[in-house]
A protein has these predicted regions:
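Solvent-exposed loop segments of extracellular immunoglobulin-like
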Residues: 13-23, 89-97, 166-174
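Proline-enriched interdomain boundary motifs that mark the N-terminal boundary
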Residues: 66-73, 142-149, 219-226
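Exposed beta-strand and adjacent loop surfaces of beta-rich binding modules
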Residues: 6, 16, 42, 58, ...
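A short beta-strand segment in extracellular, disulfide-stabilized domains
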Residues: 3-13, 79-89, 153-166, 230
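Solvent-exposed segments in extracellular or luminal domains encompassing
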Residues: 29-43, 105-119, 180-196
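Interdomain boundary/hinge segments at the C-termini of tandem beta-sandwich modules
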Residues: 59-65, 135-141, 212-218
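Short, exposed coil/turn segments at beta-strand boundaries within extracellular/luminal domains
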Residues: 2, 27, 50-56, 78, ...
C-alpha cells in the first residue's frame, strides 16, 4: 500500500479471531480489520473455533517508500517577472493554484504571481502513490519613482535638466545628447524632439522604466534686407 493508506483484511474459518500487533489495526478482534501501517509490517491472526481449538496465520502488508518531491527555482522575484520552477521525485504532477502558471511540461512551469504566492505540488509516483510539497515565491514591488524636467519645450542649443528620485541606480537613454547617462540628475541638449527613457533600479535589483518627451523647436531664420541708397 501507499504511505498513509489502509488495507482491509478479512479472515474466515473460525468463530472468533485475535489480531496482532493491534496498534495499526482498527480492531484486535473480528473477522475483518483495517490495517494502516506506516512501514512494512507482519501481522498475525489467531482463529478459535467453537470447540476452543486454535490456529494462526501470518501475513505481511508492504508499504511503499514515500516519494520526496524537490522543487528548484527562484523564490524571490520582482513584480512583473517570471520564475521557472522544476519539480522532481515523481512522474506526474499537479500544480495549484494554476491561474498564475504556464505549464511548459508536466514537471516544469513558469510562475508569474502578482503578489507573494505559495504553490502546492502533488506528485504521483510509479506505484500510484501521492506525495505533496509547497514552494513559495516572494514578489518584491518595483520602485516608485518621480521624474521631472526643468522644461519640456526647448529651442535648439538650449539644455534641459532631469531630476529623478525613488531608486538607487539610474540609467538614461539615449545617451548621445546627455552630459551623463547615470545619476539622479542629468542634463540634455537635444537637437530635435527626443523621447528620453529612465530605467531606475532599487536595492532589491527591481527596475522600472519611465519616458519623458522634450520638444525642440527650430531657431527663427532672420532675413536682412538693406535699404537701397540713392
Amino acid at each position: 500500500i501507499c504511505p498513509n493508506a489502509f488495507s482491509t483484511v478479512s479472515v474466515s474459518g473460525a468463530a472468533t479471531y485475535i489480531w496482532s500487533p493491534s496498534n495499526t489495526l482498527s480492531s484486535s478482534i473480528g473477522s475483518s480489520v483495517t490495517a494502516s501501517p506506516s512501514t512494512t509490517t507482519q501481522y498475525k491472526v489467531v482463529g478459535i473455533d467453537n470447540n476452543g481449538c486454535r490456529d494462526s496465520s501470518n501475513f505481511s502488508i508492504s508499504v511503499y517508500p514515500l516519494s520526496v518531491l524537490n522543487v528548484a527555482g527562484t523564490s524571490v522575484i520582482c513584480e512583473g517577472d517570471t520564475s521557472t520552477l522544476t519539480v522532481s521525485g515523481a512522474i506526474n504532477y499537479v500544480w495549484s493554484p494554476s491561474s498564475s502558471l504556464n505549464v511548459s511540461n508536466n514537471n516544469i512551469v513558469d510562475a508569474f504571481p502578482i503578489a507573494t504566492e505559495t504553490y502546492t505540488i502533488s506528485g504521483t509516483d510509479l506505484n500510484s502513490c501521492n506525495s505533496e510539497t509547497t514552494h513559495t515565491i516572494n514578489v518584491l514591488p518595483t520602485p516608485i519613482i518621480s521624474l521631472s524636467s526643468s522644461d519640456d519645450t526647448l529651442c535648439i542649443g538650449s539644455a534641459v535638466i532631469f531630476n529623478a528620485a525613488g531608486a538607487s541606480q539610474y540609467s538614461w537613454q539615449p545617451s548621445s545628447t546627455l552630459n551623463n547617462n547615470t545619476g539622479s540628475t542629468v542634463s540634455a541638449m537635444p537637437n530635435s524632439t527626443t523621447i528620453y527613457t529612465l530605467t531606475a533600479t532599487d536595492t532589491n535589483n527591481c527596475s522600472v522604466s519611465q519616458n519623458i518627451t522634450i520638444q525642440v523647436n527650430p531657431l527663427p531664420i532672420l532675413t536682412i534686407s538693406p535699404n537701397s541708397i540713392t
